[in-house]
Regions:
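Catalytic cores of carbohydrate-active enzymes across secretory and cytosolic contexts
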Residues: 1-226
Length: 226
């Protein structure tokens, strides 16, 4: 609240910064405070830059597009595959745009090898007996409330109608030890999975780390974003 913020930071702010300008509906606007004290500010895409600049006209905002290092995050089997079919892709990642020119069966063959590795590991950690022939959905990231890992269970009847016998889901991710909300989400997923026993196979893999993250992302058929 505004009153609490005044007690905490009064005397620490520059004289030309008017505290009331950072208050909206008696709630302190942390974003504006952060922008004021930042040397530079950026969005994560060109569109994000435009939206943020329209919202905060007094602050110059640029953009740095989110992305990944294509070599680091690609499964080793696909690196070898693209070395054969897209020569030069390592130094010129735009060549990956030509992936649709590679016959699909060849791509599926490599993917299925990665999928078998994932399913083998998952089955070594669970008694659910996941099937490598079934569409596999993956969701693996830090268990924070805003990431909404449990959103897929919002309509259980619809999920059951769509997924019974047709899909299986692999979850993974850790919550901060003091993040009670994050731990509650993990608990919610595990409990929800039990309600689908015998209908849809759902597992939550423990001890999430970079190795497991790579195994899941390279092995699932569909990556779930919420």
């Amino acid at each position: 609240s505004y009153d609490r913020v005044k007690k905490l930071i009064r005397g620490l702010l520059p004289g030309k910064l008017k505290l009331p300008s950072l208050v909206q509906d008696d709630v302190f606007h942390m974003t504006e405070l952060g922008l004021y004290f930042s040397r530079s500010s950026n969005g994560v895409s060109r569109l994000h830059e435009k939206v943020a600049q329209d919202q905060f006209k007094w602050k110059k905002i640029k953009h740095i597009t989110n992305g990944v290092h294509h070599i680091y995050w690609m499964a080793g089997s696909f690196k070898d595959f693209y070395d054969v079919h897209l020569d030069g892709w390592r130094s010129n990642p735009e060549l990956l745009l030509q992936v649709d020119q590679i016959p699909s069966p060849l791509i599926y063959a490599v993917h299925n090898e990665n999928k078998k590795k994932l399913i083998a590991y998952a089955n070594s950690q669970s008694s659910k007996a996941l099937d490598p022939e079934v569409l596999t959905i993956g969701f693996a990231r830090r268990a924070a409330t805003y990431k909404r890992a449990h959103l897929i269970f919002h309509d259980m009847e619809k999920l059951l109608d769509i997924g019974q016998g047709n899909l299986q889901i692999i979850f993974s991710g850790k919550a901060h030890p003091k993040d009670m909300g994050g731990k509650s989400i993990i608990r919610n997923i595990v409990q929800s999975a039990k309600r689908f026993d015998g209908k849809i196979k759902i597992i939550y893999l423990e001890n999430y780390d970079m190795w497991l993250g790579r195994l899941i992302t390279s092995g699932v058929d569909l990556w779930l974003n919420t």
